């Protein structure tokens, strides 16, 4: 049985970030929104638990600070264009998590009931995988 490569994607933000481990088929294995202070511990845990082989990092807000920390893990770091990823993440979150009558509202009128940075991280991973396949 060949093992799929797992990548860790990080959507960097000022006080919080989205993190997700995605396999090379694009399946999210774990995703969560964490405080910036939890970054090291979470990354360490995900690398150990999911045999992560590569880190994907969004190229905008605070990415330099994040890259400096992520370098400590001595894995390849790939920068990914974050353009419109927050909008895509918000829409995906709303599509997958709207319940009851909220589902009847157009996506643009719905409001997420929690931060959705983890969905943005999954989208960054998908962008990296799509670029790698070309």
Locate each region found by the language model.
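Phosphate- and other anionic-substrate recognition elements at nucleic-acid/protein interfaces
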Residues: 2-10, 14-134
């Amino acid at each position: 049985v060949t093992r799929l490569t797992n990548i860790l994607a990080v959507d960097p933000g000022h006080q919080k970030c989205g993190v997700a481990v995605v396999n090379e088929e694009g399946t999210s294995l774990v995703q969560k929104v964490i405080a910036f202070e939890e970054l090291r511990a979470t990354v360490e845990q995900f690398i150990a638990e999911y045999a992560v082989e590569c880190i994907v990092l969004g190229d905008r807000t605070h990415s330099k600070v994040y890259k400096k920390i992520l370098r400590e893990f001595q894995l390849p770091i790939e920068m990914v264009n974050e353009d419109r990823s927050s909008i895509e993440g918000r829409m995906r979150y709303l599509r997958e998590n709207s319940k009851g009558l909220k589902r009847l509202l157009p996506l643009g009128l719905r409001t997420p009931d929690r931060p959705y940075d983890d969905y943005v991280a999954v989208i960054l991973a998908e962008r990296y995988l799509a670029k790698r396949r070309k």
